[in-house]
Amino acid sequence: MNLPFFLAKRIYANNTDKTRVDRPAIRIAIAGVAVGLAVMLVSVSVVFGFKHTIRNKVVGFGSHIQVANFMTLQASEQYPIQMGDSMLKVLRAIPGVRHVQRFAIKQGILKTNSDFLGVAFKGIAADYDTTFIHQHLVAGAIPHFSDSVGKQQVVISQAIADQLNLKLGDKVFAYFIDNTGVKARRFSVAVIYQTNLSQYDKVTCFIDLYTAVKLNAWETDQASGAELTVNDFDRLDDTAARVVNKVNRTIDRYGETYSSQTIQEMNPQIFSWLDLLDLNVWIILGLMLSVAGVTMISGLLIIILERTAMIGILKAVGARNVTIRRTFLWFAVFTIGKGMLIGNLIGMGLIALQHYTGLVKLNPATYYVSTVPVEFNLLVWLLLNVATLLISVFVLIAPSYLVSKINPATSMRYE
């Protein structure tokens, strides 16, 4: 059997004397590792959950990549672009693209007897993936929107419903103003949704693509553009580059120029803010590893000083400094392991509690979510545990050299 491992195991197993000086030090070291690991697990889980939740909401409103008229992407006004079957086929054939859906935007005003509100009507058809709307459905059933028949039904947010005092099934007039005059439509509220992403909830309604195209006075094969969903968000830039090479700067049969833009380019403030969360995580990880390292160093030094006589006896019977150092490093591994076990139980328990109960609430007007989102990632969990163990042991190598300074004659005479 490995001698340092055997000695460390005996020392750790027999460390039950309540009068020993090193017992509080060991407990503090275990607590330091446990708290540090628990905080790291919870912090990473919250940041992952928060980033992915907000990102998915933004993507839900605009997909990963938009292909549209060059002028539309440069200004707030909507310009049409040909989006017929041939172009859709080209977009769907691009590697990395999972789904393609058409859309048309028309600015308008929703008006009730007591109030009115300017909104953006987003026309969608049968090819539109409504999973995002279903996930945030408050009331109603999503109509089967079409590009060939007008439904006269509208999907509105809870924020719009509250401001205009609308409920499911209510009739509401919409007015559209352009160079030809004012157009009016009467819609029935078919669905109410709520994402808590206020800048979208306050202005976004969904209608059928047919009505949106007609209100814009466009041709039947024209739209505001197409939204592309990619297979892997981490490879968004690669897929976007393929879209640029395939589509950008090409001209449709009406003389309009195609262009494209990623969701990150359309929402730079939100994604820059989410990127800052990564910096916060690294700061927290650094602080927690420092706390765990300092408590372990202090504990190891106290343990070595407390067992000076034992070190002297081991040296007297021929044990080398490296053997004794390894003994105390193995002892530290046992201590760190116990702390990590407790830390994992605490951290994973808190993550599970928040995931299943939503115990910690947030102000959705500020944070875009009503509860703190958490997300468990197995790979990150493994990396955090391995990194905590390796770093904690690594920082103890230098303090363990204190063993070589202990003189066996002096230590045994003292005993």
Predicted feature residues:
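C-terminal membrane-exit region of the final transmembrane helix in multipass inner-membrane proteins
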Residues: 2, 9, 377-415
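Peri-membrane helix termini and adjoining interfacial loops of integral membrane proteins
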Residues: 2-10, 130-132, 261-263, 353-367
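Hydrophobic alpha-helical transmembrane segments of multi-pass inner-membrane transport and secretion
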Residues: 21-48, 275-310, 333-342, 390-394
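Membrane-interface junction motifs in transport/secretion proteins
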Residues: 51-85
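A structural signal for hydrophobic secondary-structure junctions
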Residues: 81, 85-221
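Mechanotransmission and gating elements of multispan inner-membrane complexes involved in transport
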Residues: 177-281
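Transmembrane alpha-helical interface segments in multi-pass membrane proteins
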Residues: 301-303, 310-354
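Short helix-loop junctions at transmembrane helix boundaries
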Residues: 338-384, 397-401, 405
